[in-house]
């Protein structure tokens, strides 16, 4: 939500201490701290966080990786534990985004010329933003959803809105959610249109928030209490991918290939198939994104 009375370190501290308390451990047990923060990536959030929750001399990794920043911090802790370098680590992701405005490209400047010349470090043409597409996140995922609908059929404005209806209903079950208000399908469809087919209620808001997790090795876990062992969640796979080069991505980013690749590798490492899943927690930055990624996870 919005926390004008708390800064980034306050939010990170609250999440970190909550995770440590929930796990029944302390900073003295941690062998690594991985801190993810994109908007203040040069601020050394991890070191600032240490000053609030405990400075024990352990290595700190500050990571910034766009929408995957928090997940990358978690993966950093997982890799450190998996390598055998440490037995236990703490991962934290935090952002202060309330009031940050539109994320993505800033739009086409008024001083920009219409002249089209090949340029750029990667051999790309001049920016397409504001000409034949957009790099702003609402625009990108609106295009992604429409492209998916044209390619496969079966989608509609109402179908995308039903995804948001379901998610708003789920929010009422989580006291820590940014918004905990159920919304009707009609309210969602009649809300302010941001980028068709996503209305405001179908877009994730820019919020302040933080999350944290304690990662522990299997051997270390066996030395902890039975209750700690019972509540521990096994990490069967953690995968990070990037986009392979495609010429068309200069106009519209391909959010599908890297997701499909990550899912495929994760299933292989975990030794399961999509049909084995009982629950999926899926990043729903926009309602259109959720539907597209259903398919990408199959």
Residue ranges and their predicted role:
Residues 40-50, 247-251, 284-298:
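Short glycine/threonine-rich loop-to-helix capping motif typified by GTGT followed
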Residues 3-5, 100-106, 172-175, 226, ...:
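Short acidic, glycine/serine/threonine-rich loops at helix termini
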Residues 132-142, 146-204, 211, 228-230:
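Functionally critical mobile loop/hinge segments
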Residues 27-30, 56-59, 83-89, 155-159, ...:
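Short coil/turn connectors at secondary-structure junctions
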Residues 1-68, 144-157, 163, 178-184, ...:
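Conserved active-site "lid/cap" helical segment
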Residues 1-9, 18, 122-131, 151, ...:
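Condensing-enzyme catalytic core mediating Claisen C-C bond formation in acyl metabolism
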Residues 37-88, 92, 96, 100-101, ...:
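Conserved catalytic cysteine-centered active-site region
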Residues 64-95, 138-173, 213-219:
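Active-site-proximal alpha-helical scaffold in enzymes
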């Amino acid at each position: 939500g919005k926390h004008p009375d708390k800064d980034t370190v306050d939010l990170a501290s609250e999440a970190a201490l909550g995770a440590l308390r929930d796990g029944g451990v302390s900073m003295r047990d941690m062998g690594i701290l991985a801190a993810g923060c994109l908007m203040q990536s040069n601020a050394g959030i991890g070191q600032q966080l240490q000053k609030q929750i405990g400075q024990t001399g352990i290595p700190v990794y500050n990571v910034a990786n766009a929408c995957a920043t928090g997940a990358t911090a978690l993966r950093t802790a997982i890799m450190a534990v998996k390598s055998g370098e440490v037995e236990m680590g703490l991962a934290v992701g935090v952002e202060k985004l309330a009031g940050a405005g539109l994320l993505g490209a800033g739009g086409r400047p008024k001083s920009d010329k219409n002249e089209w010349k090949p340029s750029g470090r990667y051999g790309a043409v001049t920016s397409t933003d504001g000409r034949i597409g957009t790099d702003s996140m609402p625009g990108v995922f609106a295009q992604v959803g429409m492209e998916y609908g044209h390619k496969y059929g079966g989608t509609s404005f109402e179908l995308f809105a039903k995804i948001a209806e379901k998610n708003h209903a789920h929010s009422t079950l989580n006291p820590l959610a940014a918004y905990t208000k159920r919304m009707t399908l009609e309210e969602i469809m009649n809300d302010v249109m941001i980028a068709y087919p996503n209305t405001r209620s179908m877009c994730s808001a820019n919020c302040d928030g933080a999350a944290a997790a304690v990662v522990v090795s299997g051997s270390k876990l066996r030395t902890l209490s039975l209750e700690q062992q019972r509540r521990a969640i096994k990490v069967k796979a953690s995968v990070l991918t990037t986009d392979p080069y495609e010429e068309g991505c200069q106009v519209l980013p391909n959010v599908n290939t890297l997701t499909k690749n990550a899912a495929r590798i994760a299933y292989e490492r975990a030794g399961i198939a999509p049909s084995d899943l009982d629950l999926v927690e899926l990043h729903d930055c926009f309602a259109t994104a959720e539907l597209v990624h259903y398919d990408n996870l199959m």
